[in-house]
């Protein structure tokens, strides 16, 4: 099992996926590293992927407030779940951070193949809009 697959398996949202599904997902990912203070997304930008935090902390500034996300958490999914495909939040690295980036095509395949993950993502996304 690759390191990337192991990192994905540690993410609570993906914990129910079998090894084959995790390896397929890992093949469609890349790594994003950022230094503290570096912006990662900004409102209005077109969302081309979502991100799972592996190391470090990010700060999310959204219309509903500011929150921090750490290892095992994710951001950027709302832009992929809506027709508009636009980012709704400003995200910056609060500490040095390493994320796994999932592109739109891989994300859409994941949702199609695993409706349970799609439901959890939708629930999480809607919860963030409250």
Language-model segments: residues:
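Hydrophobic residues at beta-strand termini and immediately following loops
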Residues: 32-34, 69, 102
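Cyclic nucleotide-binding regulatory domains
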Residues: 13, 36-96, 108, 122, ...
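A small-molecule sensor/coupling module
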Residues: 4, 19-24, 85-90, 98, ...
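Short, proline-centered helix/strand-breaking motifs
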Residues: 12, 103-104
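Cyclic nucleotide-binding regulatory module and flanking cytosolic helices
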Residues: 1-31, 35, 80, 113-114, ...
